[in-house]
Each structure stands twice: as C-alpha cells, then as structure tokens.
Amino acid sequence: MRDKVILECTECKSRNYTTKKNKKLHPDRVETNKYCKFCKKHTLHKETR
C-alpha cells in the first residue's frame, strides 16, 4: 500500500512537496534535493512524520 508523505526543507522548515511511497518496501525516510521557493535555491528535503 502506498502512503502519502510530506517533504520538508531542512533550512527553512517549510513543507513544500508531497509524494507517495510504499512503506513496506522502503521503511527508511526519504531524502532528496529539491528546489525550495522560499529559500530560492536547491536544498535537502526530508520526509516528515
């Protein structure tokens, strides 16, 4: 089953992106480099719980 996860910017703490993942196959947290429109640069975004 795929669950909705929210990605949060590590610098400004704004929650910019939502995505889906299969938590049974990938139990670890998602970390990706994405563009933050508030910081106006690419930053690391982590999954929130």
Swiss-Prot record:
Keywords: Ribonucleoprotein, Ribosomal protein
Keyword Ribonucleoprotein: yes
GO molecular function terms attached to this record: structural constituent of ribosome
GO biological process: translation
Superkingdom per UniProt: Bacteria
Family from the record: Belongs to the bacterial ribosomal protein bL33 family.
Protein name as it appears in the record: Large ribosomal subunit protein bL33
Lineage per the UniProt record: Bacteria, Bacillati, Bacillota, Tissierellia, Tissierellales
Gene name linked to the record: rpmG
